[in-house]
């Protein structure tokens, strides 16, 4: 089981309303990074995306499809570097397909800077590992209105996050090549049209790799009453074991409890009267 420590903090008071959110950093090789907020009200889709990342199946993934001004797409192919003498491009091994959540929770349109799940043809519930980022505000609109109808075609393409910083990096993919030093290769089947960073002989360093990292803003907070009893509260992550630890020195951590998150605020009482304690919440995937 992979353990991911997503936040560690102590605050002075407990808020009434706490909201968790996962922030994903997408680092595009040689181009820059963007941050995307993942939407908790698309729980199946977000959990699926995080599962691929935590399992290592997204390691060395590449942008295998680029349509300028429309989408960039990843999650389908990666570079296997297990043999240093012979790298090879291989398909990302999938866990299976997931339920379409286009209209679960808040409906969000496929507009510039949103991330959505790719699917197989017209099969509504066929998304697995592949994702795409929209490069046009009109992608979700009907074709008759000048859009690509991604919001409605065969149940729609589930939007599960949006860019919150460094959108200028996405703008590099909007104009057609050779602007911004990104080029298209259409002779590497089935990775066509594929984004590359050279017009010369292609090397492994010229692919557009995407490295992912995550942080969870869980609003972990603590307060102490007049008897010295501490109350710890945080925005839990639904369907995942939330592990609460404490430490007196930020070095040696002791587990308090493990609970399955509900997606709502959770609380835990620490009856210790130690002068100082730090707390953290880990997610056990």
Please annotate each region the language model reported:
Residues 4-14:
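Sec-dependent N-terminal signal peptides
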Residues 18-221, 227, 275, 285:
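Cross-family detector of peptidyl-prolyl cis-trans isomerase
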Residues 8, 65, 260:
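Residues that line or immediately flank small-molecule/substrate-binding pockets and catalytic motifs
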Residues 213-285:
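Short, composition-biased motifs enriched in small/polar/acidic residues
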Residues 11, 51, 56, 91, ...:
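Preference for short coil/turn "hinge" residues that link or interrupt alpha-helices
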């Amino acid at each position: 089981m992979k353990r991911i420590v997503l936040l560690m903090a102590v605050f002075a008071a407990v808020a009434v309303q706490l909201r968790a959110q996962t922030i994903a950093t997408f680092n595009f090789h040689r181009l820059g990074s963007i941050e995307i907020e993942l939407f908790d009200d698309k729980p199946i889709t977000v959990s699926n995306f995080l599962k691929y990342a935590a399992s290592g199946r997204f390691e060395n993934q590449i942008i295998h499809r680029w349509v300028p001004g429309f989408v960039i797409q990843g999650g389908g192919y990666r570079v296997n570097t297990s043999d240093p003498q012979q790298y090879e491009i291989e398909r990302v091994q999938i866990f299976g397909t997931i339920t379409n959540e286009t209209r679960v929770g808040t409906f969000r349109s496929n507009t510039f800077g949103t991330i959505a799940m790719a699917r197989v043809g017209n099969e509504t519930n066929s998304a697995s590992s592949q994702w795409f980022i929209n490069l046009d505000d009109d992608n979700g609109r009907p074709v008759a209105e000048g859009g690509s109808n991604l919001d409605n075609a065969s149940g729609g393409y589930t939007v599960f996050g949006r860019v919150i910083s460094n959108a200028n990096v996405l703008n590099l993919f909007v104009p057609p090549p050779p602007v911004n030093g990104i080029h298209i290769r259409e002779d590497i089947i089935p990775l066509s049209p594929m984004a590359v960073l050279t017009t010369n002989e292609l090397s492994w360093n010229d692919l557009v790799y995407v490295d992912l990292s995550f942080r969870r803003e869980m609003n972990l907070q603590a307060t102490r009453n007049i008897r010295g009893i501490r109350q710890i509260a945080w925005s839990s992550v639904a369907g995942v074991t939330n592990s609460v630890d404490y430490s007196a020195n930020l070095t040696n951590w002791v587990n308090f409890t493990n609970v399955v998150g509900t997606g709502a605020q959770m609380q835990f009482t620490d009856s210790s009267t130690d002068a100082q304690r730090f707390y953290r919440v880990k997610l056990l995937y």
